[in-house]
Amino acid sequence: MKGLIVDEPWISKILRGEKHWEMRSQATAVRGLVALIRKGSGKIVGVARVTGCRGPLSLDELRANKDRHCVSMDEFESGRAMKWTTAWELIGAQSLPTPVPYKHP
């Protein structure tokens, strides 16, 4: 199974079902179930299904979909987040009852 390393607060938002697009700098060909790894923890804390990618997205598209990616538009408009304009679409995120140790290959 592939893994996706995600920083806070984004991974918690994904696991709570609040965030459905994980913003990245590039598209992925990966589809299906992926492990969700909390950045810096060395733990798999959940799973989600990658169903597709969109982008690179324009500022207007990012603005129209803020409820899906949950990133402040100030981050994009200031240029701080402009490298993250490709959305990885996630569905069915679930927390694991007990986090599983993960070692990066």
Report each predicted region and the residues it spans.
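Structured alpha/beta reader/binder surfaces that contact nucleic acids or chromatin modification marks
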Residues: 1-105
